[in-house]
């Protein structure tokens, strides 16, 4: 989505699920298309503006400020599904997935076609080690955006954490085809794939 750039940070932070060593650098994630979204709730301008400020802060890694602004947006409009989803993913990272998931669920109940919330839910479920649920939500993102590199990559990490070699390699290959060196660099340092490092197909 052109108005949402924070999916990238979710991918970057998800690297914290497992690095062999060093600090993960941010891959360049594509935006999730807004065209698929069916509007079901009109967000008031003041709440929308606060949400955009929150998303910008989150995209810069300023999560405390992003949460403060997201809460302000929600105070202005309790059904601002964009702010609810953003709050949910922040809480999922900073407190626990169980704290964040209900806010993302509420966002999806208000706007079921909001693809960013599907992505946020996929990441939150992965953080909670609910790998099958995470795969379901990444697949929803791919249904709306078949070229979404980091959803293929997210599915690959889920299968890797489940020690499903064949599926992990299959989805990782799809991610590499779309994302190239950014994906290769991420996979080379994240311990999701540690058990595959000596595998000829992984190399």
Per-range role (PLM):
Residues 47-48, 81-82, 115-116, 149-150, ...:
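Helix-start (N-cap) detector for alpha-helical repeat units in TPR-like alpha-solenoids
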């Amino acid at each position: 989505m052109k108005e949402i750039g924070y999916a990238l940070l979710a991918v970057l932070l998800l690297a914290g699920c497992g690095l062999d060593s060093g600090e993960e650098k941010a891959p360049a994630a594509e935006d999730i298309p807004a065209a698929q979204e069916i509007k079901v709730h009109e967000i008031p301008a003041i709440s929308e503006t606060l949400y955009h400020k929150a998303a910008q802060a989150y995209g810069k890694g300023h999560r405390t400020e992003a949460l403060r602004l997201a809460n302000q947006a929600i105070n202005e409009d309790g059904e601002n599904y964009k702010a609810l989803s953003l709050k949910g993913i922040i809480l999922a990272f900073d407190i626990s997935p169980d704290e964040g998931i209900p806010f993302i669920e509420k966002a999806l109940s208000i706007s079921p076609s909001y693809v960013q919330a599907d992505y946020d839910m996929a990441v939150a479920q992965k953080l909670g080690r609910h790998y099958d649920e995470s795969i379901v939500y990444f697949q929803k993102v791919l249904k709306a955006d078949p070229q979404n590199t980091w959803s293929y990559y997210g599915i690959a990490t889920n299968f890797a954490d489940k020690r499903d070699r064949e599926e992990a390699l299959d989805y990782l290959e799809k991610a590499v085809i779309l994302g190239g060196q950014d994906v290769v660099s991420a996979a080379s340092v994240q311990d999701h794939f540690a058990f595959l490092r000596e595998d000829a197909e992984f190399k």
